[in-house]
């Protein structure tokens, strides 16, 4: 018997095809952009090396989404702060300074000890009551604590303390600061999509003109709008490809979400140099989404057996046993990977595609296992069955590997071999994505008869209530964030530039699965965010 989820149609249609002839930045914009960039660089270089001014400038540049222009200068500044950290920050009793420097360094991959916060606690390890009205200090501590690793109870306590007191302060704050704190409580810097956050922070800083140099705001707005034009052209090309592929019309059960998936890839890397990587990743996301719908919704167990075997073979001859709708999908999938291979061959990087296909095979095996659980009405064991399979069914290994396909020379064969072994950072990312998805999909899946989700597995295995299962699974997610944070600290096995897509894929999952499955039900809230990022220029 076939299932159906009756997904709503695309909310975007052919909208982005209208940008086929959109030009990039005009001559004035390019000149203005270069001039302003030079001025911001001067501000960064000339600000005193170990000062709150330098810390806040770096933070603002990052939040406004323009730090990719100044990576060298920011790295130099933070390296200098790291080398003199004990001497400067060790002696400081300003919570905002200590927490901000701690976060900026951890964010950059530097390990600094959380013991630096002990000076703000009493003998029992509780934070001093004198801090409860220090809004900027609390907000900085809250953001810093999101970068915690295991055995940092002082940061675990910091999250409880700051969350409680920032919520209590909200009614007393100015409108702009209140909006900023509310946004941070829902979307902390370490757990949100950079482009969506940038759009918000530009508006926050515009409201609070005194706290940020007007030149910097103007530069951020101009940069945002120039990039947005580029995204519109990219989205136009991808929409055309999607229409020519025509799979969702042929497969009426599949979610038509190409714009949402481009937005997903933008969460992984938004910078101009990743144009090719974004294009490939978006297309892989499209195939993963359709594969999910075939295995999760439409395919019979017999059909899924045949498709799994065909994908394992990766040979057009395997098509003969497939049903007509699967033939279309399978042919398109093989053609796509062949095309990517041809493109990468020009740069002697075609070896990458074999790694990507290998991950795709693991993904369909995991989807097939879930289908067998469904058809057998089986509730698997939480740890050794469900979570083990969930590493792959989260699609994170497939997407992380695919995210490297169009990247630069740092994505070596050794790096691909490393990620194919499921290193801890990838397992953590996968666990987070799997469990976040499970939480927001649970009620809907129960209605349609799915029993194999982490919530159901946990309830059955531990005799827990639904609420207890949710609480425990949120704890597991937080513990995996600690593993992920640890995996991003130097020294790393592969260059950090390769770890960023893994981290950013996790951030996208946190963003998309915050209150609901915003990908599946994109007409609810996600469409407004996508409109702001992809379609709505900021008034200059």
Swiss-Prot record:
Its cofactor is Mg(2+); Mn(2+). SUPFAM superfamilies: Terpenoid cyclases/Protein prenyltransferases, Terpenoid synthases. Mg(2+) 2 binds at residues 292, 296. Its EC number is 4.2.3.-. Binds 3 Mg(2+) or Mn(2+) ions per subunit. Sesquiterpene synthase involved in the biosynthesis of volatile compounds. Mediates the conversion of (2E,6E)-farnesyl diphosphate (FPP) into germacrene A. This is Sesquiterpene synthase 15b. The gene is TPS15b.
């Amino acid at each position: 018997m076939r299932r159906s989820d009756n997904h709503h149609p695309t909310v975007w249609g052919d909208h982005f095809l209208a940008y086929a002839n959109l030009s990039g930045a005009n001559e004035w914009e390019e000149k203005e952009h270069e001039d302003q960039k030079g001025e911001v660089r001067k501000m960064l270089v000339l600000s005193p090396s170990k000062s709150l001014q330098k810390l806040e400038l770096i933070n603002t540049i990052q939040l406004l989404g323009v730090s990719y222009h100044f990576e060298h200068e920011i790295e130099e500044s933070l390296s200098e702060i790291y080398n003199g950290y004990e001497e400067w920050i060790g002696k400081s009793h300003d919570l905002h300074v200590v927490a901000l420097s701690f976060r900026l360094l951890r964010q950059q991959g530097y390990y600094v000890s959380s013991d630096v916060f002990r000076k703000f606690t009493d003998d029992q390890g509780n934070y001093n009551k004198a801090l409860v009205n220090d809004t900027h200090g609390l907000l900085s501590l809250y953001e810093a604590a999101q970068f915690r690793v295991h055995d940092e109870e002082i940061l675990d306590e910091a999250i409880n303390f700051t969350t409680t007191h920032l919520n209590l302060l909200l009614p007393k704050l100015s409108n702009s600061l209140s909006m900023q704190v509310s946004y941070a409580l829902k979307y902390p810097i370490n757990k949100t999509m950079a482009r969506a956050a940038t759009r918000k922070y530009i508006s926050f800083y515009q409201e609070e003109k005194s706290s940020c140099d007007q030149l910097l705001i103007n530069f951020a707005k101009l940069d945002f709008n120039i990039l947005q034009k580029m995204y519109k052209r990219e989205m136009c090309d991808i929409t055309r490809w999607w229409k020519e592929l025509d799979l969702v019309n042929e497969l009426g059960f599949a979610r038509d979400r190409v714009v949402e998936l481009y937005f997903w890839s933008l969460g992984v890397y938004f910078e101009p140099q990743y144009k090719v990587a974004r294009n490939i990743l978006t297309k892989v996301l499209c195939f993963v989404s359709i594969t999910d719908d075939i295995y999760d919704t439409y395919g019979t167990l017999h059909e899924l057996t045949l498709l799994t075997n065909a994908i394992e073979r990766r040979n057009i001859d395997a098509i003969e046993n497939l049903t007509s709708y699967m033939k279309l999908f399978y042919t398109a999938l093989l053609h796509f990977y062949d095309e990517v291979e041809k493109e990468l061959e020009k740069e002697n990087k075609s070896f990458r595609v074999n790694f990507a296909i290998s991950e795709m095979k693991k993904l369909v095996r995991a989807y097939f296992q879930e289908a067998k659980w469904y058809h057998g009405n089986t509730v698997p064991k939480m740890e050794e069955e469900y979570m083990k399979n969930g590493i792959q069914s989260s699609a994170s290994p497939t997407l992380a590997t695919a995210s490297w396909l169009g990247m630069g020379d740092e994505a070596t064969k050794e790096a691909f071999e490393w990620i194919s072994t499921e290193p801890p950072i990838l397992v953590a990312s996968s666990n987070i994505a799997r469990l976040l998805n499970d939480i927001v999909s649970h009620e809907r899946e129960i209605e349609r008869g799915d029993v194999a989700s982490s919530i159901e597995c946990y309830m059955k295995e531990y005799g827990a209530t639904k609420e207890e299962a949710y609480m425990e699974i949120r704890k597991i997610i937080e513990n995996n964030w600690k593993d992920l944070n640890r995996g991003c600290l130097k020294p790393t096995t592969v260059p950090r530039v390769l770890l960023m897509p893994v981290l950013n894929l996790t951030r996208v999952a946190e963003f998309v699965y915050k209150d609901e499955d915003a990908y599946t039900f994109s007409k609810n809230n996600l469409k407004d965010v996508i409109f702001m990022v992809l379609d709505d220029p900021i008034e200059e």
